[in-house]
Each structure stands twice: as structure tokens, then as C-alpha cells.
Curated annotation (Swiss-Prot):
Subcellular location, principal: cytoplasm
Active site as annotated: 103, 200
Source organism, top-level taxon: Bacteria
Protein localization: Cytoplasm
Taxonomic path: Bacteria, Pseudomonadati, Pseudomonadota, Gammaproteobacteria, Enterobacterales
One matching Pfam family: tRNA_Me_trans_C
Chain's role: Catalyzes the 2-thiolation of uridine at the wobble position (U34) of tRNA(Lys), tRNA(Glu) and tRNA(Gln), leading to the formation of s(2)U34, the first step of tRNA-mnm(5)s(2)U34 synthesis. Sulfur is provided by IscS, via a sulfur-relay system. Binds ATP and its substrate tRNAs.
Name assigned to this protein: tRNA-specific 2-thiouridylase MnmA
EC number: 2.8.1.13
């Protein structure tokens, strides 16, 4: 009998293939496994987005196949208070937040972790995230997933070593095709289900339509940053993010040349969207950033200069940088090379090789 047989693991079952295979792998490792389906959003009956019922049915089918119990819990109130309201506040302020990071911080590794431990008597929780846990000197580290294309450590940088110590990430050691293959061999209901895309509470709905239901759009001018020439009208600053080139409606401007136009700045006070031509326009480039609301996985604040790499958005190549503490829970990050489309409100996440050190929210970008 495995040493794990006395250990109870609650797997966050999303109705997707990754959490399905995670439950199976933990069973194979000898753990006592149960599933938990979290409902984090109350849908409106009049929308087409009703995937929660399908996801729950898929999670139940997988649990039935594996012979494990599935619990359900409703965290919609916690989600609204701790994730969604902050998401709206950030958009109102002209920034671009990442609600998936907030959801992991407030729901999956806080509300879920507490519920699993206190109500279900769990020793661990597990999720289908593509990350790895590595314990060194009694502290748990967060490592990138083995599959570089699927690594999700960027979304989990707010976790502390204590939270990681209570979490298992079985698919983090695998590549995505291996996960699909296991699901197909087991004939799991989720084997061929496509990966979910988009923000969890919006699903496949059009983002602008969704946002307009909660924040009134305020149309305003689009100006060329080089000469203040009017280029058109935007429907609301909240619909645009730095570096965006699609959906501006200003293609083919007279005497405009061939290069595409990009969003390079937002003047929230005056409701102006600034654009420039070319993906290497100086106003699009940043030499660094200032970050706040810092989270370090080892819980040790930075006290000296640090050489490492940083990601300023998911699925982006690492940028070599120097991080300097400013005190007051802020840091300056200087890139070795200028980098495009650094976006306030998004997260900057730091790495030493495969180890995720932590990160913070981008407060401003440095343009010199």
C-alpha cells in the first residue's frame, strides 16, 4: 500500500481534460481522491453563455468513471466581491487587469483551499494547472510546468510557499499531448473537449458586449501621438489596451503609409486614446516598469538588487532585467532591451530559470 493512502486530496474539477487527468494520476499515486466543482459565476438566463451546466455534467461523468465522489460549492458571492468588483474598478481607471490571477489568489487557492481543509477534511488540494512544486529546505517552490507552451506559473505568482505546500499539480510534469492521450485511453468524457479560452466569467461571449453591461461606454477621440491629428472615435477607453492594433477602425488613413496603427497611450482624465504607427514606435516601447502590490512566493521582501527575468504578460518570452526595491512595497524593473506594450494593471512576474519568484501589478511603464 502506498504511503499516500491515508492522505485525502480534493481535486478542483472544472469539467476540463487537465483536472480530469489530474484526478486519475492522483488515484494512481495512491491518494484518497474526491472532486469539487466550484460555481464562481451566476449566469443570466438570457445569455448564450451557459457552459457551467455542461462543465458540471462533464466533471460528474469523469468522477463516475473514476469512481470518486464529486462535491459542489458556490463561491459566486466571494467571486463577485473579491474578483469581479476589482476587475471593474481597474477597467474604470483605464487599466487592464488580469482576473484569472485574482481568481487563483482569492478563490482557487484561498476559498477552495479553506473549504477543502475545513469542510472536507483534505490534506491537499489539487488543480489541473501546468506548474510544478519543488520542496527545498522545508519550503515549497513554484516551478514552470514541463510543457513550455502550457506553463501557467504566470497566473499563480500570488501563491505563498504555504499555499503551494498544500497543493498538488499532477499534470505539471507532463506535456499537453500526453494528458490528452491519457484521457483518450481512459475514454474520459473530457478527452476531446477543447481548452477553455477567455476570462472565466465571460466565456466565449464578446468581451466588449459583456463589459458594456456593467460599465457605461464613453466614446471619445483617437489622436495620433506624433501630431495630435484626429484619427477617429473610440467607443470607450476600457475596450483598448496598450499595444492593441485590431479593432481601432483607422486602417488605410490618407498619407498614413503602410504600417499598422497601435494603441500607445490612454489619457483617462480627458478620455483620449493615443495611437502611433509601427510596432517599434518609441511611444510603444518601455525601458522598464514600476510594480506595486508585490507577492513573493517565499514571503521574503526584496532588500537588494536582483538580476532575473520577467514576463509582463502570459505567453511572452522572458525579458532579462534588474529589479531594485524602492521601499513602500514597490520595485523598479529595468529591462536589458526596450520592450513593447508593457501595460499598467497587468502583472509582472519574475523568474530565476524555472523558479517563479513572485511578481506584482504594473503601476507605470518607464519610457526612458
Amino acid at each position: 500500500m502506498s504511503d499516500n493512502s491515508q492522505k485525502k486530496v480534493i481535486v478542483g474539477m472544472s469539467g476540463g481534460v487537465d483536472s480530469s487527468v489530474s484526478a486519475y494520476l492522483l488515484q494512481q499515486q495512491g491518494y484518497h481522491v474526491e472532486g469539487l466543482f466550484m460555481k464562481n459565476w451566476e449566469e443570466d438566463d438570457d445569455t448564450e453563455y451557459c457552459s457551467a451546466a455542461t462543465d458540471l455534467a462533464d466533471a460528474q461523468a469523469v468522477c463516475d468513471k473514476l469512481g470518486i465522489e464529486l462535491h459542489t460549492v458556490n463561491f459566486a458571492a466571494e467571486y463577485w466581491d473579491n474578483v469581479f468588483e476589482l476587475f471593474l474598478e481597474e477597467y474604470k481607471a483605464g487599466r487592464t487587469p488580469n482576473p484569472d490571477i485574482l481568481c487563483n489568489k482569492e478563490i482557487k487557492f484561498k476559498a477552495f483551499l479553506e473549504f477543502a481543509a475545513e469542510d472536507l477534511g483534505a490534506d491537499y488540494i489539487a488543480t489541473g494547472h501546468y506548474v510544478r512544486r519543488h520542496d527545498v529546505d522545508g519550503k515549497s517552490r513554484l516551478l514552470r510546468g514541463m510543457d513550455g507552451n502550457k506553463d501557467q506559473s504566470y497566473f499563480l505568482y500570488t501563491l505563498s510557499h504555504e499555499q503551494i505546500a498544500q497543493s498538488l499539480f499532477p499534470v505539471g510534469e507532463l506535456e499537453k499531448p500526453q494528458v490528452r492521450k491519457i484521457a483518450e485511453e481512459l475514454e474520459l468524457a473530457t478527452a476531446k473537449k477543447k481548452d477553455s479560452t477567455g476570462i472565466c466569467f465571460i466565456g466565449e461571449r464578446k468581451f466588449t458586449d459583456f463589459l458594456a453591461r456593467y460599465l457605461p461606454a464613453q466614446p471619445g477621440p483617437i489622436l495620433s501621438v506624433d501630431d495630435n491629428k484626429p484619427m477617429g472615435q473610440h467607443q470607450g477607453l476600457m475596450y483598448h489596451t496598450l499595444g492593441q492594433r485590431k479593432g481601432l477602425g483607422i486602417g488605410g488613413v490618407k498619407d498614413g503609409g503602410e504600417d499598422p496603427w497601435y494603441v500607445v497611450d490612454k489619457d483617462v482624465a480627458n478620455n483620449i486614446l493615443y495611437v502611433a504607427q509601427g510596432h517599434e514606435h518609441p511611444r510603444l516601447m518601455s525601458y522598464g516598469l514600476i510594480a506595486q502590490q508585490l507577492h513573493w512566493v517565499d514571503r521574503q521582501p526584496l532588500t537588494a538588487e536582483l538580476r532575473c527575468t520577467v514576463k509582463t504578460r502570459y505567453r511572452q518570452a522572458d525579458i532579462s532585467c534588474t529589479v531594485t526595491p524602492l521601499g513602500d512595497d514597490r520595485i523598479t524593473v529595468r529591462f536589458d532591451e526596450p520592450f513593447a506594450a508593457v501595460t499598467p494593471g497587468q502583472s509582472a512576474v519574475f523568474y530565476l530559470d524555472d523558479v517563479c519568484l513572485g511578481g506584482g501589478i504594473i503601476e507605470e511603464r518607464l519610457q526612458e
